[in-house]
């Protein structure tokens, strides 16, 4: 419904087109494309969608705005930080035809779209070619790697005292995240 487009809520508006925003984040070293394949997925989208009747029964537009403001906060946690979110908009301009017809009045379908860059934290280790042999195998840098893969998202396995478990070589044992 075009006359309701102004009621859409932009929790985060894009500053440019997504490709340019991606390139700027790469230049600013917010993200890394190190090892990224040419056909890799560079963008993700979360859609928070709740049955129209829920909002209709709980206060409509104002209730939906607060609900999706909270959902946006959850999205920030899900994607790892607001800096990775390119845009987030709650749509308030789409009419639910079936409910509207059944109730004899306009009922709108509220939902939230969040477009983001998927990242995982990745530690880059010093290689065997490093001149200072004491550094080999230690963390050289930590990057935010653009990736939909969750294999880098593994967390250390902890003992009953909360300390990381080590394998026979003294390296931290990781719990698989997938």
Predicted regions and their residues:
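N-terminal nicking endonuclease/strand-transfer module with a His-rich metal-binding environment
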Residues: 1-178
């Amino acid at each position: 419904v075009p006359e309701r487009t102004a009621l859409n809520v932009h929790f985060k508006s894009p500053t440019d087109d997504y490709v340019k925003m991606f390139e700027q984040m790469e230049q600013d070293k917010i993200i890394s494309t190190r090892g990224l394949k040419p056909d890799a997925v560079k963008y993700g989208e979360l859609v928070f969608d709740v049955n129209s009747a829920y909002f209709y029964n709980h206060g409509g537009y104002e209730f939906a705005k607060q609900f999706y403001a909270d959902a946006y906060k959850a999205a920030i946690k899900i994607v790892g930080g607001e800096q990775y979110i390119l845009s987030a908009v709650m749509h308030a301009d789409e009419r639910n035809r079936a409910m509207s017809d059944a109730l004899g009045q306009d009922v709108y379908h509220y939902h939230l779209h969040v477009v983001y860059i998927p990242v995982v934290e990745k530690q880059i280790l010093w290689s065997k070619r490093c001149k200072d042999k004491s550094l080999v195998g230690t963390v050289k840098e930590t990057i935010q790697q653009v990736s939909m893969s969750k294999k880098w998202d593994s967390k250390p396995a902890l003992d009953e005292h909360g300390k990381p478990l080590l394998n026979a070589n003294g390296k931290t044992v990781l719990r698989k995240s997938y």
